[in-house]
Amino acid sequence: MSNIPSDLRYATTHEWVRPEGDGTFTVGISEHAQELLGDMVFVELPDVGATVSAGDDIAVAESVKAASDVYAPIGGEIVGVNEDLEDSPELVNSDPYGDGWLFRIKADDADEVEGLLDAEGYENSIEEE
């Protein structure tokens, strides 16, 4: 079973969201998602300053197996991206909840995060796949 930290919220599309306490949220893909994709070879990140809506496909994770869209789990403005992934996309595999984060978003409505799954709900959604 994949590692599913209880302090994060999750989208059914396998993105995780971590509040940073200043109205911004860090987003990445779950350990389960990176296990399905395999070894990352490239990550296409959104543009800083872009305004996105929940459910928009805004990034691409490319692995040796496949390319997979990454969706915005909440709406808002992209305020930062993980530039380390440009040279080291494998961070998504080795540390999906830490150094392998993808982007930061300033939420239009922070309450939108409450509509995402908690760890138990996400684990149940994986088991139903």
Curated annotation (Swiss-Prot):
Residues 24-106 form the Lipoyl-binding domain. GO terms for cellular component: cytosol; glycine cleavage complex. Keywords: Lipoyl. Binds 1 lipoyl cofactor covalently. Its cofactor is (R)-lipoate. The modification N6-lipoyllysine is found at K65. InterPro entries: 2-oxoA_DH_lipoyl-BS, Biotin_lipoyl, GCV_H, GCV_H/Fam206, GCV_H_sub, Single_hybrid_motif. One of its GO terms (biological process) is glycine decarboxylation via glycine cleavage system. The glycine cleavage system is composed of four proteins: P, T, L and H. The glycine cleavage system catalyzes the degradation of glycine. The H protein shuttles the methylamine group of glycine from the P protein to the T protein. Belongs to the GcvH family. This is Glycine cleavage system H protein. It comes from Pseudoalteromonas atlantica (strain T6c / ATCC BAA-1087). The lineage of its organism: Bacteria, Pseudomonadati, Pseudomonadota, Gammaproteobacteria, Alteromonadales.
